[in-house]
Amino acid sequence: MKNKHITPARRTSLELLNKILVSNKPFEKIILSSKKFLSLDDKDKRFTRLIITTVLRKFGQIDFIINQFIKKGSIKKNNLKNIIRIGIAELIFIKSAKYAAINEAVETTKINYSNRLSKFTNAVLRNIDRDKEKLSSMITDEMNYPSWLIEDWKQTWGTKQTKEIINYFQKEPYLDISVAGDPQEMEKVVKGKIIYNKTLRIDEIINPSKLPFYQTENSNYHWWVQDVAASIPAQLLINSDKIKIVDLCAAPGGKTIQLLKANKKVISVDVSNERIKILEQNLRRLNL
């Protein structure tokens, strides 16, 4: 049967989620080695990432919700459980249209299993949607972390700071970029905010390739994706002379680019061939 009813993003999300949860391989490695994911258009890539990261980030809460409606161990097929997990992620957290989220989960179950199990998926998700306000009041972000880790954080940082850590990790990550030129000028150009030295934060969730000057010969407008914390170690090395620098786990290349822009010589190493290709692409984009 052709899976004509299932959008490419949801179909790919299920396939990748299945691999992530059984392979014990890094999220990015599985994503970047997936021909299906790489063949998606930008919109579907973003939605696929959103679905998968939401399921992973809210995993404990999602499984708590499942356990309110299904006896533990009653779903023998992990693939089916992941279909329901994606449906819950869409209904409760992503706020997808109810019809789209439920209908596509039902169709996916029908294609992968049977009409009988598709009715099961339909019943579970409709019950969850009906009770979603009550369920939302029952779940906490702490459910997404092992209890031993929560206790360790509380002993180390205290209860208040632990809550702040959890809240931070539950948010969609910001997009930080480092700039080669004047950060105040680039702040206006990319509509970001200077948060440290030459690091700008873009609050909008956006594909970096859509930002101004993604491709430019003018080195004054060069920028690259780099978390603010990742920029600090390289900053400490920039004023050091006559040192050899090896950047381990270098991809996607933020620290390498930062050091090359400061006229340092760098040996960049990464265990992943896929990520090395991304590093090379980023270096070529900036004529390095």
Describe each model-derived feature in a short phrase.
Residues 1-288:
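S-adenosylmethionine
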